[in-house]
Amino acid sequence: MKLLFQTILRISNQLPKRKTQQKISLLKQKSIEAKLSGGEAKIKSQHERGKLTARERIEILIDPGTFEETDRFIVNQPNEFDDSGEKFLGEAVITGYGKINNKTVFLYAQDFTVLGGSLSQAVANKICKIMDLAMQNGAPVIGLIDSGGARIQEGVNSLAGYSSIFLKNTRASGVIPQISVILGPAAGGATYSPALTDFIFMVSNIGQMYITGPEVIKAVTGEKVSHEELGGADTHASKSGVAHFTAESEADCFNQVRKLIEFLPQNNLDEPSQENEHFDP
């Protein structure tokens, strides 16, 4: 009887450890799956367009080893217009916080490899949450924009998500620095949020901002324009005045963002950084 009791006790002690190990293994597996975003084929397609993936962009922009991702395991919700049943961990945006030149920043990076970076209600919730955290901590928020616009399969829910983001933009205005980096299409509703932020960076030949694309312009007016002519970096830097900075490559663009962060105060209660160097007038 004593031996039986000891055996039962030993097995019962082992069960929680096994369950814990199983959960840890599942967590590691899901983390690897989340890092693949839309899958290897979509990542390859992104590279063929001359663009980096959302995670590659974060690695270049943020100080090494400082990025902490939030809401990594949120998935896209099924709807009646999508019968594929595909689930993407993290949805079409990566959110989190980290350091740039040892200064805390919050950011979101739209992931074009997941359903074209389209905005769903879940994506909007993630973006709004990271903007709230930036406000609570008094730190800049940076948006890496690469999106085809609203996820039309979700109808008004997607559009409602945009309105929530716009509200966050207006409430953060004058309180914390807001920076938008246009690294792909910013079409339709995706255009308004960057326009509400303090600084807009655009990369030539890959970043565009417009309400409607060239196809719609042609159908309505008969005019033929390219994506770059309609909403490229040169157009917004020299004609509309929407863009404040332009760059020839993503790497150059991120260097410019990092440089700007050096000069900005963290929030409206902070003082701008002081230069120790003295220049001869």
Residue map of PLM features:
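Terminal-region recognition feature
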Residues: 1-179, 183-192, 196-216, 221-281
